[in-house]
A protein has these predicted regions:
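N-terminal export signals
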Residues: 2, 8-26
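OB-fold and OB-like single-stranded nucleic-acid-recognition modules
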Residues: 25-148
Length: 148
């Protein structure tokens, strides 16, 4: 029986590790402050970070706005807690720092104003929800959330 050198043992160990599949990349953390690069006469301009994360998994924390109903498959995530229903207000009262969150499945929503952390796929571009008529520029799809 031939003795195995330390070097051969280390190389064999590293090669065996290389055969394991790599874990899927973790979701990138996004903040409300990083959503937009600028605001001008042409409207909001998405930040380079947002553009780079299009169709990628993200994690973002914020506050669940008062929902339309107690159980739903979507809600609005805001930077700051809202005491009013965003759907019940005029455009003048509509906050700029919001994301629409579409859950992977309908779920009971937490108390309005509760801080939550959302994980899902970032979607960019104008979209009109066929059921609610809600218009959004940024969405998190196939999402889940937990109380922060």
């Amino acid at each position: 029986m031939m003795p195995i050198s330390r070097r051969d043992l280390i190389v064999a160990g590293l090669l065996s590790l290389a055969t394991f599949p790599l874990k899927a990349s973790a979701a990138d953390v996004l903040t409300f402050d990083a959503l937009y690069e600028s605001f001008g006469v042409l409207g909001l301009k998405f930040s380079p970070q947002v553009l780079a994360l299009k169709d990628h998994p993200i994690v973002i924390s914020g506050y669940m706005a008062p929902p339309l109903r107690a159980e739903s498959d979507f809600f609005v995530l805001t930077k700051n807690p809202l005491s009013i229903c965003p759907f019940c207000q005029s455009d003048a009262d509509w906050p700029l720092d919001i994301l629409v969150v579409y859950l992977a499945e309908a779920s009971p929503l937490v108390t309005a104003g509760a801080k939550v952390t959302v994980t899902g796929m970032l979607e960019i571009g104008s979209y009109i929800d066929p059921d609610s008529g809600f218009v959004s520029q940024l969405r998190v799809r196939n999402a889940s959330y937990r109380k922060a």
